[in-house]
Amino acid sequence: MLKRRIIPCLDVKAGRVVKGVAFLNHRDAGDPVELAAAYDAGGADELVFYDITASSDERAIMVDVVERTAAQVFIPLTVGGGLRTVEDMYRMLRAGADKVSINTAAVLNPQLIEDGARRFGSQCIVLSIDARRVNASDEPPRWQVFTHTGRDPRPTGLDAIEWARRGVELGAGEIVINSMDEDGVGGGYDIDLLRAITEAVNVPVIASGGVGSPEHMYAGLVEGRADAVLAASIFHFGAYTIRDVKQYLAERGVPVRL
């Protein structure tokens, strides 16, 4: 049985790791390279860097962060944020990333998924989806895709489930599904959303947004059927270690790399 993955997520702004609530009110969490090395030593299965820097002229900082991180860690590294072209993807992969994650740019130009997959292989292309529940309380669950979530969330009119399916058809090899309603809150993943996505696609799905405890990760992996779980605050600020989480999951029969 495939091992379930525990993946720390590092939001990088102007060369520092930050974490906010619902994409706002950022707290400094440290140096990205130092944190990445600590997570590697602490048993993380992969790492995700999201560049949330507002200005494109600081993008070179992220390339430097990726290069220095890749020189120190030996687990897969995914990089996203501000990647708008195949050349942007190439720059990050050349710097040392194993995978690239695209979100807003893919919605604006779905061909980017196909072009990236054709050049680098589907295994390199991660489609990240920010979704918000939009149904009324007396309606079946429905989630809409939003873009520009770091600064100015914009509704797209796209159904999150349909967008995930289309992304896979275009060549995405993995899906990250992030609940905007739960992001940074610590109340747990949106299991309904997660389950809907995992049942709709045949590629690995990573749960994101809202984890506050090992119990939430267990729910995401077992009830939500995710292949991996992403977390930030609970690791960055010391609430739990990766080994704490893996021990908890292993004791409950979830296959993890110890």
Curated annotation (Swiss-Prot):
One of its GO terms (biological process) is L-histidine biosynthetic process. Its EC number is 4.3.2.10. One of its GO terms (cellular component) is cytoplasm. The active site is at D11, D130. Pathway: Amino-acid biosynthesis; L-histidine biosynthesis; L-histidine from 5-phospho-alpha-D-ribose 1-diphosphate: step 5/9. One of its GO terms (molecular function) is lyase activity. It is found in: Cytoplasm. Keywords: Amino-acid biosynthesis, Cytoplasm, Histidine biosynthesis, Lyase. SUPFAM superfamilies: Ribulose-phoshate binding barrel. It is an enzyme of class 4 (lyase). It catalyses: 5-[(5-phospho-1-deoxy-D-ribulos-1-ylimino)methylamino]-1-(5-phospho-beta-D-ribosyl)imidazole-4-carboxamide + L-glutamine = D-erythro-1-(imidazol-4-yl)glycerol 3-phosphate + 5-amino-1-(5-phospho-beta-D-ribosyl)imidazole-4-carboxamide + L-glutamate + H(+). Heterodimer of HisH and HisF. IGPS catalyzes the conversion of PRFAR and glutamine to IGP, AICAR and glutamate. The HisF subunit catalyzes the cyclization activity that produces IGP and AICAR from PRFAR using the ammonia provided by the HisH subunit. Belongs to the HisA/HisF family. PANTHER family: IMIDAZOLE GLYCEROL PHOSPHATE SYNTHASE HISHF (PTHR21235:SF2), IMIDAZOLE GLYCEROL PHOSPHATE SYNTHASE SUBUNIT HISF/H IGP SYNTHASE SUBUNIT HISF/H (PTHR21235). This is Imidazole glycerol phosphate synthase subunit HisF. It comes from Roseiflexus sp. (strain RS-1).
